[in-house]
Amino acid sequence: MIEAQATSTIDIRPFESLGHANHGWLNARHHFSFAGYGDPSRMGWGALRVWNDDRIAPQTGFPPHPHADMEIITYVRTGAISHKDSLGNSGRTEAGDVQVMSAGTGIQHAEYNMEQEETALFQIWIIPDVRGGEPSWGTRRFPEQAGDGWTVFASGMDGDVEALPIRASARVLGARLKAGDSIDYALGEGRHGYLVPATGTVEIDNRRVNARDGVALRGGDYRITALEDAELVLVDSL
C-alpha cells in the first residue's frame, strides 16, 4: 500500500485511460499529452513532461529525428533497443537497463528494435533545469534482483553518484518487489512523484494499482506494498 500524509495527494490513472496510438509497428500509450494525443489536464507532472509506454515491432523503429532541451530516459522492459546519434554514439540497451540522452543544444538520433521479438519500453522526458548545454548519451546495466531497495537509474540530485547523470533536479528510480514486500519513499515538500508498476500489482492508499497504471503523487512519505511480484519505476521531480 502507499500510505500518505494528509497533505499529500494520490491520483491513479488507469492504463485504459491513457492516450493511445497504434501505428502498426509502434503501439504506444501516453501518460501525458504527446503527438496526436492532447489532454489539457495531462500536460505533465512537475518537470516530468512525457511518459510513453511503447511496444515496438521487430526490425522496426524510429528513424533519425532531432531533440533539444530535454532529458530523455529510456527504460527497456523487454527486448532491446539500438541507438545511434549524430555525436557518433551507438549502443544496444537490453531489458532492465537504462539509457539517458541529454539533448542540450540539439542532437539527432535513431532508435531501432533490431531483435526478432517485440521490444517494450518506457520513454520518459524530463525538462532540464537550464536550457542548452552540450548534448550527451549514455547507457548502463543495473542489478535485477528483488529486495535491494530503490536503484537510482538517472539523477541530477546531489549524492546520486552511481546514477546516469541528467541536467534536472530529478531522479528516475526502480525497484523489484516480491509479493507481500513493501518499500518506502519520502517525496520532499513541493516535489512531484510519478509511479508506474511496469509489472505486477500494488496497493495504493487501499486502492489497487495494476501493471502500467500511472500514479501521480505530491510530497509525502509513502509505502508501496506488492500484491504480487512487481517491478516499479518512479520519477521524483520538482
Language-model regions, residue ranges each:
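Jelly-roll (double-stranded beta-helix
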Residues: 1-238
